[in-house]
Amino acid sequence: MSKDDLIQFTGTVLELLPNATFRVKLENDHIIIAHTSGRMRKNRIRILLGDKVTVEMTPYDLTKGRVIHRH
């Protein structure tokens, strides 16, 4: 699967979970579990409750995603 196959959504962080994982409410009112991308971990970008984030998801599993940007 290439990068072109990934779907991006904007959402809001609802809950902070262990191991850099978050419960995110997307703009289409779906709630998913998302983890922090490797570059965000490497650069120590903090994500807090209520932050607007961009989430990248695969079309095969629409319940999990990866946070790639914090607004």
Swiss-Prot record:
Listed InterPro entries: NA-bd_OB-fold, RNA-binding_domain_S1_IF1, TIF_IF1
S1-like domain boundaries: 1-71
Record keywords: Cytoplasm, Initiation factor, Protein biosynthesis, RNA-binding, rRNA-binding
TM regions (residue ranges): none
Pfam families named in the record: eIF-1a
UniProt keyword RNA-binding, yes or no: yes
Coiled coil: none
Subcellular location: Cytoplasm
This protein's GO CC annotations: cytosol
Family indicated by similarity: Belongs to the IF-1 family.
Function in brief: One of the essential components for the initiation of protein synthesis. Stabilizes the binding of IF-2 and IF-3 on the 30S subunit to which N-formylmethionyl-tRNA(fMet) subsequently binds. Helps modulate mRNA selection, yielding the 30S pre-initiation complex (PIC). Upon addition of the 50S ribosomal subunit IF-1, IF-2 and IF-3 are released leaving the mature 70S translation initiation complex.
Subunit structure: Component of the 30S ribosomal translation pre-initiation complex which assembles on the 30S ribosome in the order IF-2 and IF-3, IF-1 and N-formylmethionyl-tRNA(fMet); mRNA recruitment can occur at any time during PIC assembly.
Protein name: Translation initiation factor IF-1
Phylogenetic classification of the source organism: Bacteria, Pseudomonadati, Pseudomonadota, Alphaproteobacteria, Rickettsiales
Gene label: infA
